Amino acid sequence: MRGEIMDYTICREIGKGGFGKVYEVKKKADQKSYALKIETNAPKAGRNSIINEIQAYSELQGCEKIPRLVDHGSYEGLTFLVLPLLKYSLKDLLERHPRFFTKKSATIVGKKLLNAIEFIHGKGRLHRDIKPENVMFGHNNRIYLVDFGMSAPYLRGDGSHIPEVGGKSVSGTLWYMSINTHRGIEQSRRDDLESLFYLLILLYKSRLPWMEPGASVSKKQEARTKEIKENLSVYDLCDGIHGKEHLIKFFQHISSLEFAEKPNYRYLNSLLDKIFHSNKELQGYKRAPKKEDTGLIRTSLWHKFISILSPFEVKYDG
């Protein structure tokens, strides 16, 4: 797409997916850069992910870890939304250097995401697609949780919790979805937190046992991933992580939750604090590299990222 969309001039395409495309745009009035997400085709009858995302962002304004909804509207019958232009995703960082994270920096990311998830849940919503692609870093050195196209309320109009039902189609991203989601059980708060747990394991160990880079998402791949998750013990999954006893308790709390039960976010946060303050590092850089090191991200991006994570002490919000 070239040219203009309403009050915005299109600069370049920066992303795409089943929903449509994302463009870097400039607002005509002030020439500031933003990210504009728009459908590529008018949706057929049923769920419209961008309209759903607009609704979610509208409900979630007020959390510093959720991007501000700048604008939204319709252009030639296609729905669009406008958000601040963020720099890069956690996925970008991991692809450039899989062993980038120390235990402490990974734990800080986990604490910030836990805080964002608690806020989302407090507004009666689920994210339903926690993964590295949806964790972004902004120009103000903040971590943001983005992409609410798959988000859904877990509370009904009368304030009651949605019922637990089976036979649901699988939704989310294969590597990070919960075991219950694999089993076709309706998602609730516990499922977002299980996805966060898997993301933490990825940051601590640089991989997940069921990940097969480049593998196509198929019924066979889905079944194989489900089987590994069901049969692999949390003790084996956390093996090699110093402070693993706290991470094991993190998972055990999540897996013990009933469908409609409220998680104990404060307890989960305290477990991450204990991991953070355990003495040894598992992997990753222990210090910033020397200036003469000219690797792709080992200098400038490292120092940028350290500024994001400083100070290390992340307080519990709420």
UniProtKB/Swiss-Prot annotation:
SMART domains: S_TKc. It comes from the Eukaryota. It catalyses: L-seryl-[protein] + ATP = O-phospho-L-seryl-[protein] + ADP + H(+); L-threonyl-[protein] + ATP = O-phospho-L-threonyl-[protein] + ADP + H(+). InterPro entries: CK1_Ser-Thr_kinase, Kinase-like_dom_sf, Prot_kinase_dom, Protein_kinase_ATP_BS. Its EC number is 2.7.11.1. Its main location: nucleus. Coiled coil: none annotated. One of its GO terms (cellular component) is nucleus. ATP binds at residues 14-22, 37. It is found in: Nucleus. It holds the Pfam family Pkinase. Keywords: ATP-binding, DNA damage, DNA repair, Kinase, Nucleotide-binding, Nucleus, Serine/threonine-protein kinase, Transferase. Residues 8-276 form the Protein kinase domain. GO terms for biological process: DNA repair. Gene3D superfamilies: Transferase(Phosphotransferase) domain 1. GO terms for molecular function: ATP binding; protein serine kinase activity; protein serine/threonine kinase activity. PANTHER family: CASEIN KINASE-RELATED (PTHR11909). Belongs to the protein kinase superfamily. CK1 Ser/Thr protein kinase family. Casein kinase I subfamily. Involved in DNA repair. May regulate the activity of protein(s) involved in double strand break repair caused by gamma rays. This is Probable casein kinase I homolog ECU11_1980. It comes from Encephalitozoon cuniculi (strain GB-M1) (Microsporidian parasite).
